[in-house]
Amino acid sequence: ISTHIKSINEKWSGINKNMLRINDVLDTAIHGHKTAKRQLKRIIGQWMNGKQTGYCFGFEGPPGVGKTSLAKKGLAQCLINDNDNSHRPFAFIPIGGSSNGSTLSGHNYTYVGSTWGRIVDILMEKKCMNPIIFIDELDKVSRSEHGKEIIGILTHLVDSTQNDSFQDKYFNGVDLDLSK
């Protein structure tokens, strides 16, 4: 019994140290934003206990208040890979004014000059199936039918009932599990 209690105490001590480190990282990343930081700590705590897989959320606010800094310098630095102590890879996709879903999900490989989309590009570049992907300027996506296509692709990416089978048009028929 004492060995079991010692094991529980060691695990709790490790979690407590991690949460204190996460608090410091978030405070160093950006001043203020107490509500957002509290919510991020709650989400990270869920990841740490192993009961939460991928998670999608959004930051809202006027330009220049620190949304990108909170994600890049805060969240990405808080999430550490247990294998090599590296931080979670971070990728940035600005989509303001975009009017073509192929930017995200690729072009069919039969077209001359076709290529895979930005999502697959990030996975290959970061050599990771669960990087933090920050999609900026969602409110500025074209309101045309092509803009609706972009919103549909993004919905597929964040919907936990669908994102375990994302397909880039370039790699037609190959499911990518983005649920982690």
What are these regions (language model features)?
Residues 135-175:
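Conserved catalytic/switch belt of AAA+ P-loop NTPases
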Residues 110-133, 167-175:
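Conserved alpha-helical scaffold flanking the Walker A/P-loop in AAA+ ATPase domains
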Residues 15-60, 119-120:
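Pre-Walker A (pre-P-loop) alpha-helix and adjacent loop at the N terminus of AAA/AAA+ ATPase modules
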Residues 1-18:
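Interdomain "pre-motor" coupling segment immediately N-terminal to P-loop NTPase/helicase cores
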Residues 93-121, 147-159:
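Conserved AAA+ P-loop NTPase core
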Residues 53-94, 124-125:
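Walker A/P-loop
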Residues 52-57, 129-131, 179-180:
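Pre-Walker A (Motif I) flank of P-loop NTPase domains
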Residues 47-53, 89, 115-117, 162-172:
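Active-site phosphate-binding and catalytic loops of NTP-dependent enzymes
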